[in-house]
UniProtKB/Swiss-Prot annotation:
InterPro entries tied to this protein: Rhodanese-like_dom (IPR001763), Rhodanese-like_dom_sf (IPR036873), TrhO (IPR020936), TRHO_N (IPR040503)
Annotated active site: C177
Name of the protein: tRNA uridine(34) hydroxylase
Taxonomic classification: Bacteria, Pseudomonadati, Pseudomonadota, Gammaproteobacteria, Alteromonadales
Keywords: Oxidoreductase, tRNA processing
Membership in a protein family: Belongs to the TrhO family.
Length: 326
C-alpha cells in the first residue's frame, strides 16, 4: 500500500469573493478523493488535507491557476493510513482565530527565519523563545528552553503578551508554531504592540523537522498534529500518542492503564470535567462504534460514503448467495 501524503497549507491573501471558491475547491478535492478540511475567509486559506501524491500535486496545481492562491505555503508528511474521515471546505471569518481586530499579516509581519538558521537564533541568550501553541500541544514536545504561555486557545495569546512581554525589556522575540500560520498573526500582533525585533520559524515545526537532522536538532519530544495521527516524530512519521475520543487530548499508553481511562468516554485529562449527561452520550456513542465494528462496518465517525458502500457490498453478497441457493 502506498503512503498517504498529508499536506498542511495556508496563505494570507485578500479573497474578496472567497465564498465562490468553496464549490469548485470541494469538487476538485472530491474528484481526487482528497480528505481533510480547508478554511476559506476573506483573509486567505488554511487547512490540512491528505491523499495520493498525484492527488495532492493536482490540488496544488489547481491553486496555481486561481488568482491569489498561487505559490501557496505547504508542508508535506506521510502516513500509512488516511488520517481524515471526511472532505470539507468551510467558510470562516478568520483562517486562524486570534480574536483581535485589525491584525493583518499581509501588511506587517515578523522576520522569517529559515530552519537551517533557527538554531543559531534561539541559542542567542538575548532572544526569548515563545511557543505560540496551546498547552496540550506544548506538553508533548517543544524547542529546548522555549517558554510555554499555557494557553488553552490561540485567543488567549494576546493576553499572555500583555501580561508577560514588554517591548522595552524583550528586545528580541522568536516564536514558532506547527506550520507557521499562527506565527503570522502572533508576530504581526507583537509588531503592532511596538516590539522591534520579532522573528518566527518559516514553515513552522514541521518544516524544521523535515530539513534539520535529528542529531543537530534542538527539538525535544513529538509534534502534535490536528489529524488522526495525533503526533509525528522527528522523521515526520506517526508518533506514540493516541487521542482521547471524549476531549481530543493526546494520551499515552500509560494513560490508558489508569482507572480514569475508559475507551471513547474519558481519560485522565477530562475525567473530572465531563458532565454526567455528556458522559452518557459518550458511552452510547462508544457502544455504537463497537456494534459497527462487530458488523464489519466502518467506524461511526468515518466517511458516510464508506459506511454506505460497506453496507451495499454486504447486501449484494447476501443477495448473490440467496440467488445461488434458489
Amino acid at each position: 500500500m502506498s503512503q498517504v501524503v498529508v499536506c498542511a497549507l495556508y496563505k494570507f491573501v485578500t479573497l474578496p469573493h472567497y465564498e465562490s471558491l468553496r464549490a469548485p475547491l470541494l469538487a476538485v478535492m472530491e474528484a481526487s478523493d482528497i480528505r481533510g478540511t480547508l478554511l476559506l475567509a476573506q483573509e486567505g486559506i488554511n487547512g490540512t488535507v491528505a491523499g495520493t501524491q498525484a492527488a495532492i500535486d493536482g490540488l496544488l496545481a489547481w491553486f496555481d491557476t486561481q488568482e491569489g492562491l498561487d505559490n501557496i505555503v505547504s508542508k508535506v508528511s506521510f502516513d500509512a493510513q488516511m488520517p481524515f474521515y471526511r472532505t470539507k471546505v468551510k467558510l470562516k471569518k478568520e483562517i486562524v482565530t486570534m480574536g483581535v481586530e485589525g491584525i493583518d499579516p499581509r501588511k506587517v509581519v515578523g522576520t522569517y527565519v529559515k530552519p537551517k538558521d533557527w538554531n543559531a537564533l534561539i541559542s542567542d541568550p538575548d532572544v526569548i523563545l515563545v511557543d505560540t501553541r496551546n498547552d496540550y500541544e506544548v506538553q508533548i514536545g517543544t524547542f529546548k528552553h522555549a517558554v510555554n504561555p499555557v494557553t488553552e486557545t490561540f485567543r488567549e495569546f494576546p493576553e499572555y503578551v500583555k501580561q508577560n512581554l514588554d517591548p522595552a525589556k524583550h528586545k528580541k522575540v522568536a516564536m514558532f508554531c506547527t506550520g507557521g500560520i499562527r506565527c503570522e498573526k502572533s508576530t504581526a500582533y507583537l509588531k503592532e504592540q511596538g516590539f522591534d525585533e520579532v522573528y518566527h520559524l518559516e514553515g513552522g515545526i514541521l518544516k524544521y523537522l523535515e530539513e534539520v537532522k535529528q542529531e543537530e536538532s534542538l527539538w525535544e519530544g513529538e509534534c502534535f498534529v490536528f489529524d488522526n495521527r495525533v503526533s509525528v516524530n522527528h522523521n515526520l512519521e506517526k508518533g506514540v500518542y493516541d487521542q482521547c475520543n471524549a476531549c481530543r487530548m493526546p494520551i499515552t499508553e500509560q494513560d490508558k492503564l489508569l482507572p480514569s481511562f475508559v475507551q471513547g468516554v474519558s481519560c485522565p485529562h477530562c475525567i473530572d470535567k465531563i458532565p454526567q449527561e455528556q458522559r452518557q452520550r459518550f458511552i452510547e456513542r462508544e457502544r455504537q462504534v463497537q456494534l459497527a465494528r462487530q458488523r464489519g462496518e466502518a467506524h461511526i465517525g468515518s466517511d458516510v460514503k464508506q459506511v454506505i458502500a460497506t453496507r451495499r457490498e454486504k447486501k449484494d453478497s447476501l443477495r448473490k448467495a440467496q440467488n445461488e441457493q434458489s
